[in-house]
Amino acid sequence: MAISSSTSGTSSSFPSRTTVMLLLFFFAASVGITDAQVGVCYGMQGNNLPPVSEVIALYKKSNITRMRIYDPNRAVLEALRGSNIELILGVPNSDLQSLTNPSNAKSWVQKNVRGFWSSVLFRYIAVGNEISPVNRGTAWLAQFVLPAMRNIHDAIRSAGLQDQIKVSTAIDLTLVGNSYPPSAGAFRDDVRSYLDPIIGFLSSIRSPLLANIYPYFTYAYNPRDISLPYALFTSPSVVVWDGQRGYKNLFDATLDALYSALERASGGSLEVVVSESGWPSAGAFAATFDNGRTYLSNLIQHVKGGTPKRPNRAIETYLFAMFDENKKQPEVEKHFGLFFPNKWQKYNLNFSAEKNWDISTEHNATILFLKSDM
């Protein structure tokens, strides 16, 4: 369509410079300039962690605009008021049975969500973390997850917040029985009766599935068949071909296997939020400072671009975790922090948030990146 220019008083087929700039601005906005895609999980299993107020200040100082917490800690919620930090709020596994009672779920939402909205920006409610019907430690809780999810969602809807706050649950990848090649990804047969109804519910309310994805553990359990560069995003060439799709890193292969598993469970429309991912700096095989820094910095740059199966779609991702936590077990679990408890950056990395105005791509977003200044 021709745009008239008034500079000469006659019609022209060429737009003015001002018009072009305006069009570029609105086009850039239309293709997805959004908040940073990367957040950081705030675990609190340490006896030497900074006061909550200092932690929130550190998030803000570091331009980390999204957070995940694992229970409705009152001090954290109070400190988040007015911070503009978007939050994944966890429902502890220990609360699941109680929340199968609709009245209890309504009270939980009233106390922990309504009481803080909208000065706290709740993004998701994660109802349970890594529940598995085939894990002896959590199997007895599996029966409570979906009823609790339904009741929390109903309470959120009764509050009129269903469009602002989505309800989900966080899984780990042990529920995926086959992951190679990624297109053959499928959930274990013995978890389908648990997981399929959850997938159906998430699809019906248009909520994403939360998934904790750790290439570190996959590599550490099988270093003979998986190369370290493939796990760290440093492979210079394709490692795995899956039809026409080439995989240069384990993260993409893992996530695409999950997408394939969801398709086989009638959940192909679901988005996946990577609710945890990280690499330890000590405590076990391949857990080193250099590997941690390499993985995290590459992950943050990588997730703005999607996977081979779902390209050009930023992947909302939460790094695990903000601090080393000295009360966790086993030893390796103590060393996932991006910061030491004294608030020093473990990797001497510089967090920054900036707009990406490259309109040549379809996935423009505000990118939170890690840049080493070592």
From Swiss-Prot:
Glycosylation site positions: N63, N350, N364
Localization per record: Vacuole
Keyword Signal part of the UniProt annotation: yes
Tissues and organs where the protein is expressed, per its UniProt entry: Expressed at highest levels in laticifer cells of the petiole.
GO CC annotation terms, alphabetical: vacuole
pH dependence as annotated: Optimum pH is 4.5-5.0. The enzyme from cv. GT.1 displays a second optimum pH at 6.7.
Keywords, ordered alphabetically: Allergen, Glycoprotein, Glycosidase, Hydrolase, Plant defense, Pyrrolidone carboxylic acid, Signal, Vacuole
Signal peptide: 1-36
EC identifiers of the protein: 3.2.1.39
GO biological process: carbohydrate metabolic process; defense response
PTM: Glycosylated in cv. GT.1 and cv. RRIM 600 but not in cv. PR 261. Asn-350 is glycosylated only in cv. GT.1 due to the presence of Ser-352. In cv. PR 261 and cv. RRIM 600, Ser-352 is replaced by Gly so Asn-350 is not glycosylated.
GO molecular function list: glucan endo-1,3-beta-D-glucosidase activity
Residue ranges of the propeptide: 357-374
Residues forming the catalytic site: E130, E276
Positions carrying Pyrrolidone carboxylic acid: Q37
Enzyme class: hydrolase
Domain of life of the native organism: Eukaryota
InterPro entries per record: Glyco_hydro_17 (IPR000490), Glyco_hydro_17_plant (IPR044965), Glycoside_hydrolase_SF (IPR017853)
Protein function: Possesses beta-1,3-endoglucanase activity in vitro. Is thought to be an important plant defense-related product against fungal pathogens.
Subunit structure as annotated in this protein's UniProt entry: Monomer.
Family: Belongs to the glycosyl hydrolase 17 family.
Name recorded for this polypeptide: Glucan endo-1,3-beta-glucosidase, basic vacuolar isoform
